[in-house]
Regions:
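Phosphate-binding glycine-rich loop
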Residues: 46-90, 104-106, 114-116, 138-150
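A short beta-strand submotif of the Rossmann-like class I SAM-dependent methyltransferase core
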Residues: 68, 93, 156-160
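N-terminal "arm"/small-domain region of PLP-dependent enzymes with the aminotransferase-like
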Residues: 1-43
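Short beta->alpha hinge that forms the Motif I/post-I loop of the SAM-binding pocket
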Residues: 96, 117
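Active-site phosphate-binding strand-loop segment of PLP-dependent enzymes
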Residues: 120-161
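Structured binding elements
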Residues: 109
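Conserved coil-to-alpha-helix start sites within the AMP-binding
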Residues: 97-101
């Protein structure tokens, strides 16, 4: 199965060579900005560049505010809190995902519920989600989505790339 998956991904990217997860790409002022950041002594979660980044994201998205987070897990955690995920709630996500997805759900006290991925995209399958919701979920009189099998609230759906 492992070899089949690797071949599938290699075919998708049109190569049998190593496919890096993250390849750095420097195309402009990165070195200059890194030196400025180091010299400012603000190299972590605060400083001029963080402030500028947050303002740029807010402006670009049309949001009133934007915040930079330390990593993707903390960003997902905040998003789930804002979505109303609480202890004993369920969150639908895909079966092929990074551990951060489930960690963020558990940090809120929730439980991940897995649906299958789309073979063409490796993202959450809309068909699998539709099938799951039709078979297992209902909107009750309280206006919330409930899993009939577990009798728990489904408070979010978290598709990942």
């Amino acid at each position: 199965m492992y070899k089949n998956f690797v071949w599938f991904v290699q075919d998708l990217y049109g190569t049998r060579d190593f496919i890096p997860l993250h390849a750095p790409r420097f195309i402009g002022n990165e070195k200059k900005y890194l030196i400025e950041t180091i010299e400012s002594t603000f190299v972590s979660s605060v400083g001029e560049f963080v402030d500028r980044f947050e303002l740029s994201v807010a402006e670009y998205t049309g949001a009133k505010y934007a915040i930079a987070t330390v990593n993707g897990t903390s960003a997902l955690h905040i998003a789930l809190i804002l979505a109303g995920v609480q202890k004993d709630h369920e969150v639908i996500t895909q079966s092929l995902t990074f551990v951060a997805t489930c960690n963020a759900i558990r940090y809120c006290g929730g439980t991940p519920v897995f649906v299958d991925v789309d073979k063409a995209t490796l993202g959450l399958s809309a068909k699998s989600l539709e099938d799951f919701l039709q078979e297992h979920a209902e909107i009750r009189n309280d206006g919330l989505c409930w899993n009939n099998g577990s009798n728990k609230i489904i408070s979010a759906c978290l598709p990942m790339h």
